[in-house]
Swiss-Prot record:
InterPro entries: Cyt_c_assembly, Cyt_c_biogenesis_CcsA, Cyt_c_biogenesis_CcsA/CcmC
PANTHER family noted in UniProt: CYTOCHROME B_B6 PROTEIN-RELATED (PTHR30071:SF1), HEME EXPORTER PROTEIN C (PTHR30071)
Gene that specifies this protein: ccsA
Coiled coil: none
Species of provenance: Populus trichocarpa (Western balsam poplar)
The UniProt record lists the keyword Plastid: yes
Function: Required during biogenesis of c-type cytochromes (cytochrome c6 and cytochrome f) at the step of heme attachment.
This protein's name: Cytochrome c biogenesis protein CcsA
Predominant localisation class: plastid
Protein's membrane topology: Multi-pass membrane protein
Length: 321
């Protein structure tokens, strides 16, 4: 009873704090002068991390196993990983470009786990025989950590696409206005050459320089986080194959979860391949990573929605009249 009460308190404290962090974070986006608000949001995420850590430890103690055996527990674990990713730049004293991604991700993931799922899914259950293995911690923790990192990296790539395409649309719009004003051809050519010279100078406008810096940082952090996520995903798939051989006598069975995990791994393998090609990196790799964002959610929720296959433990229970 004490553990259940403590879990309930920690769940609602962490969700309340991260809700306040979201409000503070958007205020700092609107008003950059409030440095104190930024520090408060970071401390709030730190509080959320400790609450989620306490929640996982509490659930681990009274359930007797690492709380990653069903959808509710994996969502809480996913929120915990998001909070860790959020704090890495903060402790390294870097500008936290990830906060726009990780704070809302923590909020929506934990919100769905706390309020969106059925109440009976919050109750810890005895592990089914197939999950009573030492491979549970290795396989599931690596997979969920990989999902979290890949989701964050994919969202950074999507943000890069939005900023880049907004710039392209603005430039195209300006060029169309020039043509509609019926400038002489030589004057248009002169203006385009002048624009090209200004573009290549070492003294760009502060607005363009900030945009360029932001794109570079999004690309840098996106690549690093996706690299970590891809490594975790690979380890998770390999450890799962070994576990499957012990449990079912086969390394691979092509059930829905395994199939979509392979598709996810392939998509991000293509992403890293595009990064090695100078002609394909940048926008092309960002597009691939953005597609990967959708694939991850299909892989993560697909089996739980269908409730079929060897990985259907802890799936949604469909109630029919």
């Amino acid at each position: 009873m004490i553990f259940l009460t403590l879990e309930h308190i920690l769940t609602h404290i962490s969700f309340s704090v991260v809700s306040i962090v979201i409000i503070i974070h958007f205020l700092t986006l609107l008003v950059n002068e409030f440095v104190g608000l930024y520090d408060s949001s970071e401390k709030g995420m730190l509080t959320t991390f400790f609450c989620l850590t306490g929640l996982l430890i509490t659930r681990w103690i009274y359930s007797g196993h690492l709380p990653i055996s069903d959808l509710y527990e994996s969502l809480i674990f996913l929120s915990w990983i998001f909070s860790i990713i959020h704090m890495v730049p903060y402790f390294k004293k870097h500008k936290n470009y990830l906060s726009t991604i990780t704070a809302p991700s923590t909020f929506f993931t934990q919100g769905f786990a706390t309020w969106g799922l059925l109440t009976d899914m919050h109750q810890s259950k005895i592990l089914v025989p197939a999950l009573q293995s030492q491979w549970l911690i290795m396989h599931v923790s690596m997979m969920v950590s990989g999902y979290a990192a890949l989701l964050c990296g994919s969202l950074l790539s999507a943000a890069l696409l939005v900023i880049t395409f907004r710039k392209v649309i603005r430039i195209v719009g300006k060029n169309n206005n020039l043509l509609n004003d019926s400038f002489p051809v030589d004057e248009i050519q002169y203006m385009m050459e002048k624009k090209s010279i200004l573009k290549n100078t070492f003294f760009p406008s502060s607005r363009n320089y900030y945009r360029f810096q932001l794109i570079q940082q999004l690309d840098h952090w996106g690549f690093r986080i996706l690299s970590i996520g891809f490594l975790f995903l690979t380890i998770g798939i390999l450890s799962g194959a070994v576990w499957a051989n012990e449990a079912w006598g086969s390394y691979w069975n092509w059930d829905p979860k395994e199939t979509w995990a392979f598709i996810t791994w392939t998509i991000f393998a293509i992403y890293f391949h595009t990064r090695t090609n100078k002609n394909l990196e940048g926008l092309n790799s960002a597009i691939v990573a953005s597609i990967g964002f959708l694939i991850i959610w299909i892989c993560y929720f697909g089996v739980n929605l269908l409730g079929i296959g060897l990985h259907s433990y802890g799936s949604f229970t469909l109630i029919s009249n």
